[in-house]
Curated annotation (Swiss-Prot):
Homodimer. This is FMN-dependent NADH:quinone oxidoreductase. Quinone reductase that provides resistance to thiol-specific stress caused by electrophilic quinones. Also exhibits azoreductase activity. Catalyzes the reductive cleavage of the azo bond in aromatic azo compounds to the corresponding amines. Binds 1 FMN per subunit. InterPro entries: Flavodoxin_fold, Flavoprotein-like_sf, FMN-dep_NADH:Q_OxRdtase_AzoR1, NADH:quinone_OxRdtase_FMN_depd. PANTHER family: FMN-DEPENDENT NADH-AZOREDUCTASE 1, FMN-DEPENDENT NADH:QUINONE OXIDOREDUCTASE. The keyword Protein biosynthesis does not apply. It catalyses: 2 a quinone + NADH + H(+) = 2 a 1,4-benzosemiquinone + NAD(+); N,N-dimethyl-1,4-phenylenediamine + anthranilate + 2 NAD(+) = 2-(4-dimethylaminophenyl)diazenylbenzoate + 2 NADH + 2 H(+). FMN binds at residues 10, 16-18, 91-94, 135-138. It comes from the Bacteria.
Length: 194
């Protein structure tokens, strides 16, 4: 694997199964080719009026607005520099963590990572692979309660990342045996991608 951007988004820190799975997966990546961003330990700003205004401004930016644009540019450059994104995406209340959504809101920028054309939206970040490690307390894969998979597939595709693999660690709150099997299944899937 060449250049890797690993995103951790769990609020559980050292107790996070998604973080552990991602950390185990990237342990053999050359450190010079690895960027790790812990979105919970180092939270990004929420998309509010001030952030949205900054990202749409074209001139005469205040110092605060320029800081938002600079942060967004840095996050986008991390994506562009990577060949593979490894995303820890635990399911919280049937969706992704706020921390991961904040990252998405800062990298999905019209005219920068996607553009509108007469034929629809065109993603501008191409040639990347994304591996999404999603952990869940219950069993949600291929069911109406799984909003993580379709959302991330759509939003990553929106910016041009269409080669997306999902790794599922499910049933983590359904007893020790079920949790152990869920982790083991995810580890086996990840081992085939290393």
């Amino acid at each position: 694997m060449s250049r890797v951007l690993a995103l951790k988004s769990s609020i559980l820190g050292d107790y996070s199964q998604s973080n552990k799975l991602v950390e185990d997966f990237i342990k053999n990546v050359d450190q010079d080719k690895l960027t790790v961003r812990d979105l919970a330990a180092n939270p990004l700003p929420v998309l509010d009026f001030a952030v949205a205004t900054a990202l749409r401004a074209t001139e005469d930016l205040s110092q605060e607005q320029q800081a938002v644009v600079d942060l967004s540019d840095t996050l986008i450059e991390e994506v562009k520099a990577a060949d593979t994104l490894v995303i820890a995406a635990p399911m919280y209340n049937f969706t992704i963590p706020t921390q991961l959504k904040n990252w998405i809101d800062l990298i999905a920028r019209a005219g920068v990572t996607f553009k509108y054309t007469e034929n629809g939206v065109q993603g501008l970040i191409e040639g990347k692979k994304a591996i999404v490690v999603t952990t869940r307390g219950g069993i949600h894969k291929d069911s109406p309660t799984d909003n993580v998979t379709p959302y991330l597939r759509t939003v990553l595709g929106f910016v041009g990342i269409t080669d997306v693999e999902f790794i599922y660690a499910e049933a983590l709150n359904m007893g020790e045996d079920a949790a152990s099997k869920g982790i083991s299944d995810a580890q086996s899937q990840l081992a085939t991608m290393a």
